[in-house]
Design a protein with these regions (language model features):
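Structural preference for beta-strand elements that scaffold enzyme active sites
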Residues: 15-19, 46-52, 86-90, 107-108, ...
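Catalytic beta/alpha-barrel core
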Residues: 69-70, 84-98, 107-120, 131-142, ...
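Catalytic alpha/beta core domains of metabolic enzymes, predominantly
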Residues: 129, 133-235
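N-terminal amphipathic alpha-helix/helix-capping segment at the start of soluble metabolic enzymes
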Residues: 1-18, 76, 267-273
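Active-site-adjacent loop and "lid" segments of alpha/beta metabolic enzymes
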Residues: 63-72, 85, 110-115, 171-175, ...
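Alpha-helix-loop-beta-strand connector modules within alpha/beta enzyme cores
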Residues: 36-40, 44-45, 64-90, 125-131, ...
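N-terminal small/glycine-rich loop or linker at the start of catalytic domains
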Residues: 7-24, 54-64, 190-205
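Glycine-rich, proline-tolerant flexible connector loops at the mouths of alpha/beta enzymes
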Residues: 22-31, 49-71, 236-246
Length: 273
């Protein structure tokens, strides 16, 4: 497997990096508070950390849902967090023209699951030279991810991460088939597990996505035990009042406990997997 290096963070090595933060940038102060707390926890546990938050939630269920403050304001906040806490940052893009602007700030460009087959978007992200993290679509077989990887490689980029976030099962349900982790790893790149979006129930509510937060630990520990190379998790300090994905963001006051368990499961996998 190709190891993907990001400063002093290595995806595909023995340590299991953590990508986390609030689903959407709600405000500068809120993001700073979350970044500070996660930095404290991950430093204590010696877990490599990449801060994540979105400047625009472009695929909200309802047109009236909060989307964020937009590209310019969002990138300014992400840049401040990056410099203030000396941590790498990531965000997602939705249009090819976002790629160059975002690449001036972030260390990883994330491609949303719904857009994972959009060739122009993949090419634009790849051509920045940044690490590109593609979230596998809910509609996509893990075997088809090889086509996504080919698009990125043919665009000159081999700094690739793939994120598993479950597959649509019937109406309004997601199921994670953990065979997808080694299947996608077989294409040569690290695979991240999205612990929070995998717990979603799309369309569970009329105007917003629901979810089963209580199953996040079970699925996460199973994914780590299946060899996941990193964990993606959206976290919040007031989950019930979060402005996006309130049903599945993980409470920040429970983050240290779940990360401690992740470390233990990772050690067991490395020793016996």
């Amino acid at each position: 497997m190709n190891k993907v290096k990001l400063d002093n963070i290595i995806f595909g090595d023995s340590a299991i990096p953590f990508i986390g933060g609030p689903c959407v940038i709600e405000s500068r102060d809120h993001c700073f508070g979350i970044a500070e707390k996660i930095t404290e926890i991950t430093s204590k546990l010696n877990i490599p950390f990449v801060f994540k938050s979105s400047f625009d939630k472009a695929n909200r269920t309802s047109i009236s849902s909060f989307r964020g403050d937009g590209l310019d304001a969002g990138l300014k906040i992400l840049e401040e967090i990056k410099n203030n806490f000396n941590i790498p940052v990531t965000t997602d893009i939705h249009l090819p023209e976002h790629a160059n602007a975002v690449s001036d700030v972030v260390d990883i460009i994330q491609i949303p699951a719904f857009l994972c087959r959009q060739t122009d978007l993949l090419v634009a992200a790849a051509q920045t030279g940044k690490v590109v993290n593609v979230k596998k679509g809910q509609f996509l077989s893990p075997y088809k991810v090889e086509n996504i990887i080919n698009k990125l490689e043919e665009s000159g980029n081999k700094n690739i991460l793939i994120t598993e976030r479950g597959n649509t099962f019937g109406f309004d349900s997601l199921v994670t088939d953990l065979k997808s982790i080694p299947i996608m790893q077989s294409f040569g790149y690290p695979v991240i597990f999205d612990a929070t979006h995998s717990a979603q129930i799309p369309g569970n509510h009329e105007s917003k996505t629901g979810g089963n937060r209580q199953f996040i630990p079970n699925q996460t520990f199973a994914a780590v035990s299946s060899g996941a190379d990193g964990i993606f998790m959206e976290v919040h300090d007031d989950v019930d009042n979060a402005l996006s994905d309130a049903s599945t963001q993980w409470p920040i006051d429970k983050l240290e406990n779940i990360l401690t368990s992740i470390i233990a499961f990772r050690k067991t996998y490395l020793d016996h997997g």
